[in-house]
């Protein structure tokens, strides 16, 4: 298997893992991501005094591999689903407890903490520094205090089991997660795939001329998918069909690309000639469908390669159209502000 074929297979496995396994449809059914909800933490979560060096020392004494930090935001439907469906699964919870002490942090918490180097800073600054820009985000730290792996977005039980296999099994020491997925996929029998993506008239057809070295009149959305991806079909059926999403999407130059396509030429925003596979490989996408947003000058301003239902997709489109990134506002902060506006309006 070549490196590029391996990457395509890795994306294929990511799509496969995005679907509920047999018998688990009810447990991993779609949820309303506009709901403002709260989940109770499992009883085995660690009560931390927010000195991560002390927490790591206690994990070492207990014979564990390190720390798992869960970053969430208040009212986050994706966080609740992950906690209720994955972390409260008895077998998954037992494996996490065996290998990691788990600490739950709030992305916007003003409380002070000490990081793994003993530096004092607010939790919210630590979250931003460590790349916890979406909720939920998981950060795994080893006993040496180094980051082992970062996981962004809702993880179904099936996907999270693979994450745990990768980290707890020590594969992060020798393989990137992408290469690990490719290795797992190489052992699976090939399945028949539909010949084409689900097409939508809001997306431009080839030739894909996305060069923005001379500023364009609209922002750009590149949607990476692949044939046979159940999550991609669901995204078209349940999200892209929404009138509000379609109204906002019409204000973008929008293209959909097959992340396995190693032949179709694409003139990228920076003027380079690529194929969809090469571009997806460079971006290191971990989940399909993936939405990558660029401003009028070709600068990437937002990437969402985690599970995204209607509300998060609407917020992503609005974030780019409002140019909130120009004010230094991260996506999760923007989402929180919009949620507070909804609460004040009684919606």
Predicted regions span which residues?
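Compositionally biased, intrinsically disordered/low-complexity regions enriched for serine, proline
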Residues: 18-19, 27
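Proteins that catalyze or organize thiol-disulfide redox chemistry
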Residues: 24-67, 73-90, 107-220, 224-250, ...
């Amino acid at each position: 298997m070549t490196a590029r074929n391996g990457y395509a297979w890795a994306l294929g496995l990511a799509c496969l893992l995005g679907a509920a396994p047999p018998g688990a449809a009810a447990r991993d059914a779609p949820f309303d991501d506009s709901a403002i909800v709260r989940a109770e933490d499992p009883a085995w979560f660690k009560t931390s005094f927010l000195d991560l060096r002390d927490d790591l020392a206690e994990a070492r004494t207990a014979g564990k591999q390190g720390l798992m930090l869960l970053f969430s935001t208040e009212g986050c439907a994706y966080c609740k689903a992950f906690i209720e469906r994955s972390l409260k699964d008895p077998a998954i919870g037992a494996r996490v407890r065996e290998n990691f002490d788990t600490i739950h942090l709030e992305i916007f918490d003003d409380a002070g903490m000490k990081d793994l180097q003993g530096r004092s800073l607010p939790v919210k600054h630590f979250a931003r520094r460590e790349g916890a820009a979406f909720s939920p985000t998981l950060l795994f730290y080893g006993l040496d205090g180094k980051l082992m792996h970062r996981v962004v977005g809702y993880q179904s039980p099936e996907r999270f089991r693979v994450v745990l296999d990768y980290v707890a099994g020590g594969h992060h020491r020798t393989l990137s997660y992408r290469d690990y997925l490719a290795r797992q996929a190489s052992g699976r029998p090939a399945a028949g795939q539909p010949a084409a993506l689900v097409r939508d008239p809001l997306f431009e057809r080839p030739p894909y001329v996305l060069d923005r070295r001379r500023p364009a009149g609209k922002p750009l959305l590149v949607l990476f998918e692949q044939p046979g991806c159940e999550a991609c079909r669901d995204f078209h059926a349940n999200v892209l069909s929404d009138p509000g999403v379609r109204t906002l999407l019409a204000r973008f130059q929008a293209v959909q690309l097959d992340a396995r396509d190693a032949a179709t030429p694409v003139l990228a925003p920076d003027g380079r000639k690529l194929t969809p596979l090469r571009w997806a490989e460079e971006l290191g996408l971990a989940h399909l469908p993936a939405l990558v947003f660029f401003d009028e000058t070709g600068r990437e301003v937002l990437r969402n390669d985690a599970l995204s239902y209607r509300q998060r997709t609407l917020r992503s489109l609005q974030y780019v159209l409002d140019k909130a990134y120009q004010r230094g506002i991260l996506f999760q902060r923007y989402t929180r502000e919009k949620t507070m506006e909804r609460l004040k309006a009684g919606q």
